[in-house]
Amino acid sequence: MENLIVAVVAYLIGSVSFAVIVSAAMGLADPRSYGSKNPGATNVLRSGNKKAAILTLIGDAFKGWLAVWLTGHFSAHFGLDDTSVAIAAIAVFLGHLYPVFFRFKGGKGVATAAGVLLAINPILGIATLLTWLIVAFFTRYSSLAALCAAIFAPLFDGFLFGANVIALSIVAMSALLIWRHRANIAKLVAGQESRIGDKKKAEAAASHKH
């Protein structure tokens, strides 16, 4: 019963889409209507509003961190263990991907996964974030950076901690993240993927809104 509650609470936390909420609060176009149509920080950046993108990034990462941190923090009080943490990790991630509050149409989970990893272990989270930053810096492809980070995250976890139940949730998150980027993979291969900072499509969408 405790793990079921953990799953439901974590999923609901994950279902809060900061990309949509922040954009609406700041009078911007719905991120699901322009660019990649993905409600995430990278696509919000295409609106040209860096503050909105940063707030989205922080919010999506925070909810991932919060769900896992709460589970660990209250583990002693409610008899929770690493299995509970693993459940919280995948549940909050699924909430972001398929949010009940937004017709189950969510983002791709990069920032939320980063928050989850930081909560599981700061070193694991930082190593994965550095992987994303290095690839993104040299290629300006957010999607390629995310794919590389998704591949390396389980490897970092295995190197740091060996076989453990939480690793299963990390592998599951990585697999889902790669699956959610399947269209991006096709665009990367075709040389048609948008780079970080590309906001032409967003500006067109915003002008149509007014």
From Swiss-Prot:
Function text: Catalyzes the transfer of an acyl group from acyl-phosphate (acyl-PO(4)) to glycerol-3-phosphate (G3P) to form lysophosphatidic acid (LPA). This enzyme utilizes acyl-phosphate as fatty acyl donor, but not acyl-CoA or acyl-ACP.
Chief site of localization: membrane
Family: Belongs to the PlsY family.
Keywords: Cell inner membrane, Cell membrane, Lipid biosynthesis, Lipid metabolism, Membrane, Phospholipid biosynthesis, Phospholipid metabolism, Transferase, Transmembrane, Transmembrane helix
UniProt topology in membrane: Multi-pass membrane protein
NCBIfam families: glycerol-3-phosphate 1-O-acyltransferase PlsY (TIGR00023)
Transmembrane segments: 4-24, 52-72, 82-102, 118-138, 159-179
Any matching Pfam family: G3P_acyltransf
EC number(s) per entry: 2.3.1.275
UniProt-listed GO biological process terms: phospholipid biosynthetic process
Localization in the cell: Cell inner membrane
Pathway: Lipid metabolism; phospholipid metabolism
Highest taxon in the source lineage: Bacteria
InterPro entries the record matches: G3P_acylTferase_PlsY
Name by which UniProt lists this protein: Glycerol-3-phosphate acyltransferase
Organism of derivation: Paraburkholderia phymatum (strain DSM 17167 / CIP 108236 / LMG 21445 / STM815) (Burkholderia phymatum)
Subunit structure, interactors included: Probably interacts with PlsX.
GO molecular function: acyl-phosphate glycerol-3-phosphate acyltransferase activity
